[in-house]
Protein backbone atom coordinates (compact mmCIF):
# COMPACT_ATOMS: atom_id res chain seq x y z
CA UNK A 1 0.00 0.00 0.00
CA UNK A 2 1.31 3.45 -0.92
CA UNK A 3 1.12 6.15 1.65
CA UNK A 4 0.72 9.73 0.57
CA UNK A 5 2.06 12.66 2.51
CA UNK A 6 -0.72 15.00 3.46
CA UNK A 7 1.36 18.22 3.20
CA UNK A 8 3.56 17.47 0.19
CA UNK A 9 2.79 20.73 -1.59
CA UNK A 10 4.15 24.16 -0.61
CA UNK A 11 1.67 26.98 -0.58
CA UNK A 12 2.48 30.52 -1.66
CA UNK A 13 3.02 31.86 1.88
CA UNK A 14 5.58 29.19 2.72
CA UNK A 15 7.41 29.82 -0.56
CA UNK A 16 7.59 33.58 0.11
CA UNK A 17 8.73 32.94 3.68
CA UNK A 18 11.51 30.59 2.49
CA UNK A 19 12.60 33.08 -0.19
CA UNK A 20 12.66 35.97 2.30
CA UNK A 21 14.69 33.95 4.84
CA UNK A 22 17.10 32.86 2.09
CA UNK A 23 17.59 36.48 0.93
CA UNK A 24 18.23 37.65 4.51
CA UNK A 25 20.73 34.83 5.05
CA UNK A 26 22.55 35.68 1.81
CA UNK A 27 22.70 39.39 2.72
CA UNK A 28 24.02 38.56 6.20
CA UNK A 29 26.74 36.33 4.77
CA UNK A 30 27.81 39.06 2.31
CA UNK A 31 27.99 41.70 5.06
CA UNK A 32 29.89 39.37 7.37
CA UNK A 33 32.27 38.43 4.53
CA UNK A 34 33.09 42.07 3.87
CA UNK A 35 33.64 42.94 7.56
CA UNK A 36 35.71 39.95 8.74
CA UNK A 37 38.91 40.80 6.77
CA UNK A 38 39.12 44.16 8.57
CA UNK A 39 38.99 42.45 11.96
CA UNK A 40 42.21 40.48 11.40
CA UNK A 41 45.34 41.69 13.15
CA UNK A 42 48.06 42.43 10.63
CA UNK A 43 51.77 42.84 11.17
CA UNK A 44 52.75 46.47 10.70
CA UNK A 45 55.53 47.00 8.17
CA UNK A 46 56.61 50.04 6.27
CA UNK A 47 55.69 53.64 6.84
CA UNK A 48 55.12 54.55 10.48
CA UNK A 49 57.34 51.98 12.15
CA UNK A 50 61.08 51.88 12.90
CA UNK A 51 63.09 50.34 10.05
CA UNK A 52 66.52 48.80 10.68
CA UNK A 53 68.78 49.64 7.73
CA UNK A 54 71.93 47.79 8.81
CA UNK A 55 75.17 48.86 10.39
CA UNK A 56 76.73 52.25 9.77
CA UNK A 57 79.82 50.59 8.27
CA UNK A 58 77.68 48.63 5.78
CA UNK A 59 75.74 51.73 4.75
CA UNK A 60 78.93 53.78 4.28
CA UNK A 61 80.46 50.91 2.26
CA UNK A 62 77.37 50.84 0.02
CA UNK A 63 77.69 54.60 -0.54
CA UNK A 64 81.38 54.23 -1.41
CA UNK A 65 80.70 51.38 -3.86
CA UNK A 66 77.93 53.29 -5.66
CA UNK A 67 79.47 56.78 -5.88
CA UNK A 68 77.17 58.03 -3.10
CA UNK A 69 73.97 56.96 -4.88
CA UNK A 70 70.96 57.09 -2.52
CA UNK A 71 69.80 53.77 -1.08
CA UNK A 72 66.05 53.16 -1.48
CA UNK A 73 64.01 51.47 1.25
CA UNK A 74 60.62 50.90 -0.40
CA UNK A 75 58.85 49.54 2.66
CA UNK A 76 59.64 52.67 4.66
CA UNK A 77 59.18 55.16 1.79
CA UNK A 78 62.61 56.73 2.20
CA UNK A 79 66.11 57.03 0.79
CA UNK A 80 69.32 56.98 2.79
CA UNK A 81 71.55 59.85 1.67
CA UNK A 82 75.25 60.41 2.22
CA UNK A 83 75.01 64.05 3.27
CA UNK A 84 78.02 66.28 3.96
CA UNK A 85 79.13 65.07 7.38
CA UNK A 86 76.76 62.17 7.93
CA UNK A 87 73.83 59.99 6.96
CA UNK A 88 70.23 61.22 6.63
CA UNK A 89 66.96 59.51 5.66
CA UNK A 90 64.86 61.50 3.16
CA UNK A 91 61.10 60.90 2.92
CA UNK A 92 60.14 60.13 -0.71
CA UNK A 93 57.14 62.48 -0.63
CA UNK A 94 57.50 65.60 -2.80
CA UNK A 95 56.94 68.82 -0.87
CA UNK A 96 55.00 70.30 -3.78
CA UNK A 97 52.00 67.97 -4.11
CA UNK A 98 53.01 64.79 -2.31
CA UNK A 99 54.04 62.57 -5.25
CA UNK A 100 56.55 59.76 -4.68
CA UNK A 101 59.95 61.06 -5.77
CA UNK A 102 62.22 58.54 -7.53
CA UNK A 103 65.99 58.64 -7.87
CA UNK A 104 67.21 59.35 -11.41
CA UNK A 105 70.66 57.83 -11.89
CA UNK A 106 70.91 59.38 -15.37
CA UNK A 107 70.45 62.91 -13.97
CA UNK A 108 72.25 62.13 -10.67
CA UNK A 109 69.42 63.70 -8.65
CA UNK A 110 65.86 63.11 -7.47
CA UNK A 111 63.30 63.99 -10.14
CA UNK A 112 59.59 64.23 -9.28
CA UNK A 113 57.50 62.88 -12.18
CA UNK A 114 54.42 64.97 -11.35
CA UNK A 115 55.65 68.54 -11.83
CA UNK A 116 59.37 68.13 -12.53
CA UNK A 117 60.80 69.25 -9.18
CA UNK A 118 64.44 68.24 -8.80
CA UNK A 119 66.32 67.60 -5.56
CA UNK A 120 70.03 67.26 -4.75
CA UNK A 121 71.26 63.69 -4.15
CA UNK A 122 73.23 64.50 -0.98
CA UNK A 123 71.03 67.05 0.79
CA UNK A 124 67.56 66.68 -0.82
CA UNK A 125 67.29 70.46 -1.24
CA UNK A 126 65.39 71.78 -4.26
CA UNK A 127 67.59 72.25 -7.33
CA UNK A 128 64.80 73.14 -9.76
CA UNK A 129 61.03 73.15 -9.96
CA UNK A 130 57.91 74.25 -8.16
CA UNK A 131 58.65 72.46 -4.86
CA UNK A 132 58.72 75.11 -2.10
CA UNK A 133 61.15 73.38 0.27
CA UNK A 134 63.52 70.39 0.56
CA UNK A 135 62.37 66.82 1.07
CA UNK A 136 61.46 66.08 4.67
CA UNK A 137 63.85 63.94 6.71
CA UNK A 138 63.07 61.04 9.01
CA UNK A 139 64.82 60.77 12.36
CA UNK A 140 67.66 58.24 12.30
CA UNK A 141 69.49 56.78 15.29
CA UNK A 142 72.41 54.47 15.89
CA UNK A 143 71.66 51.47 18.12
CA UNK A 144 73.46 48.23 18.97
CA UNK A 145 71.55 46.57 16.10
CA UNK A 146 72.62 49.21 13.58
CA UNK A 147 70.96 52.29 12.14
CA UNK A 148 67.23 52.62 12.79
CA UNK A 149 65.01 55.03 10.86
CA UNK A 150 61.79 56.26 12.51
CA UNK A 151 59.35 56.41 9.58
CA UNK A 152 56.51 58.07 11.45
CA UNK A 153 55.32 60.82 9.05
CA UNK A 154 54.09 62.88 12.02
CA UNK A 155 57.63 63.18 13.41
CA UNK A 156 59.58 64.27 10.32
CA UNK A 157 62.27 66.93 10.25
CA UNK A 158 60.64 69.70 8.21
CA UNK A 159 63.18 72.11 6.76
CA UNK A 160 61.47 75.42 5.93
CA UNK A 161 64.38 76.95 4.01
CA UNK A 162 65.84 75.60 0.81
CA UNK A 163 69.41 75.24 1.99
CA UNK A 164 71.50 72.56 3.68
CA UNK A 165 71.77 72.77 7.45
CA UNK A 166 74.34 70.42 9.04
CA UNK A 167 72.35 70.57 12.31
CA UNK A 168 69.86 68.01 10.88
CA UNK A 169 72.50 65.26 10.85
CA UNK A 170 71.75 62.72 13.58
CA UNK A 171 74.33 60.09 12.52
CA UNK A 172 77.79 61.45 11.68
CA UNK A 173 80.27 59.76 9.32
Report each predicted region and the residues it spans.
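N-terminal secretory signal peptides and thylakoid transit peptides that target proteins
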Residues: 2-26
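Short N-terminal micro-motifs specific to bacterial/archaeal maturation
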Residues: 6-7, 50, 115
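N-terminal pre-ligand scaffold of iron-sulfur
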Residues: 17-104, 137, 141-173
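Short edge beta-strand segments in beta-sheet-rich domains
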Residues: 48, 114, 121, 130-137
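Structured, soluble extracytoplasmic/luminal domains of envelope-associated proteins
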Residues: 86-128
